[in-house]
Amino acid sequence: ILKELGLDREGCYAIAFNGGLIYDCAAQKTLHRRTIPLEYARVIFEKTQEAGLYCHTYSDTSLLCRHVGEETRIYTQAIHIPVVEDPLLPEHLAKEPCKMIVIDLHDRAKMDAYRAAMEPWAKGKISMFYSSPHYLEHVPEHVSKGHAVKKLCELLQIPLANTVAAGDQENDISMIEAAAVGAAMKNATDAVKASADYITENDCNHSGVAEILRKFILA
């Protein structure tokens, strides 16, 4: 994806895994990484299985899941990543993952119930938030896109006052609030719009990001 977008060059950095990883695209080097302890990953896999929910995580190069299903196929249509199916996850996890994601394509209420049941255990350990109506993200406590924006500015010695961020889902709110200018897409959730300084006239599928670049970067 970085190559397709022309971002694999000097001066380009990627914040991945909802803030769990900061990557120097040109040097192909990890600058900052936060991970989920394996004991927590085991609990999440166990509890999602009990709830009848699909869950996957990641290695450095692949998506890791217990079984490939409709959720895997839909997810990888948008996120092009190799898939490794391993029924013995999480026992076979070689290293702590940056994030885990729970997916239900048809029953949001089931995920809401799982989230509510997990919150007492997750407090102080794991942050949970939606990145789409069907994707419930799990990252280490205090990891977010907002924290990652601040960390990247610190690493590059760039004032936070010189930052612009844009998004449309719950996992984008911390970043929108952290940046000097936070923009919400026209199709963003109400909570995202409430946190933003600017709401685009176009949605994310119709040049919403280009609108922000023209207004706040190229003007």
Predicted regions and their residues:
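Short, structured coil segments at secondary-structure junctions
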Residues: 8-10, 18, 122-124, 178-179, ...
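Active-site phosphate-binding/coordination module
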Residues: 1-72
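Conserved acidic, metal-coordinating active-site core of Asp-based
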Residues: 47-166
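Alpha-helix termination/capping residues and helix-transition junctions
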Residues: 7-8, 94, 157, 193
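Flexible, glycine-rich phosphate/dinucleotide-binding loops
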Residues: 21-23, 64, 109, 137, ...
